[in-house]
Design a protein with these regions (language model features):
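Hydrophobic alpha-helical connector segments
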Residues: 66, 77-106
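Basic, helix-initiating cap at the start of DNA-binding domains
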Residues: 1-32, 36-45, 62-65
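Solvent-exposed, amphipathic alpha-helical segments
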Residues: 24-31, 74-85
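Helix-turn-helix/winged-helix DNA-binding modules
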Residues: 31-34, 55, 84, 150
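Short secondary-structure transition hinges
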Residues: 101-145, 149-155
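Short hydrophobic/aromatic patch on the recognition helix
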Residues: 47-57
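Residues at secondary-structure transition points
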Residues: 8-12, 16, 58, 62, ...
Length: 156
C-alpha cells in the first residue's frame, strides 16, 4: 500500500513540475522568442537540473508542443464560454479573432518566426485552429437548435 501511494505522489510531483516548466517556457517564449530561450535558461530559471528538464521533455520542440497544447486548452475554454453566451456565429467568430489579436499583441514577433522551424508544432497549430473554430461554431449551432426545439415544444 505504501508503495502505491509513493508512486502516485511521484506522478503527481512530476506532473506539477512539468506544468511549472510549461508555464515558465510559455512566458519566456512569448517574451523573447523560441530560438533565444535555451533549455538551460528554463532549467536555471526554475532552479531545476537540466536532467530533470530532459527527463520530462525530449527536446525544445516537445516543450514547445506542450506550450502550444496549453494555449489550445485555454482557447478552447474561452471559446466554449463565448459560444454559450453568444447570440450568433458572427459573435463567436468576432470574439475568436479579438482574442487571437490580443494574444498576437502580447507575444514577441520572433516567437511566430521561430515556431515555423518546428514542423510538429506547425502541424499542431493548423489542426488546432480548425478544431477550435469548428467546435465553437458547432457549439453555437447546437445551442440554436435547442432554442428552436424548446420554442416548438412550448408552442404545443
Amino acid at each position: 500500500m505504501l508503495r502505491m501511494n509513493s508512486v502516485r505522489k511521484k506522478r503527481t510531483d512530476k506532473t506539477v513540475v512539468k506544468e511549472h516548466i510549461v508555464l515558465a517556457a510559455a512566458k519566456s517564449f512569448a517574451q523573447k522568442g523560441v530560438k533565444t530561450v535555451r533549455m538551460d535558461d528554463i532549467a536555471a530559471g526554475l532552479s531545476i537540473s537540466k536532467r530533470t528538464l530532459y527527463e520530462l521533455f525530449h527536446d525544445k520542440e516537445d516543450l514547445l508542443l506542450d506550450v502550444m497544447k496549453l494555449h489550445r486548452e485555454e482557447m478552447q475554454e474561452y471559446m466554449t464560454q463565448v459560444a454559450s453566451k453568444a447570440e450568433n456565429v458572427l459573435e463567436v467568430l468576432l470574439k475568436f479573432f479579438q482574442r487571437s489579436a490580443q494574444d498576437f499583441q502580447n507575444t514577441n514577433r520572433k516567437f511566430f518566426e521561430d515556431i515555423e522551424k518546428y514542423p510538429k508544432v506547425m502541424r499542431y497549430i493548423d489542426e488546432s485552429r480548425k478544431e477550435n473554430l469548428d467546435s465553437a461554431i458547432m457549439g453555437h449551432r447546437t445551442k440554436r437548435i435547442l432554442r428552436i426545439e424548446r420554442k416548438e415544444y412550448q408552442t404545443y
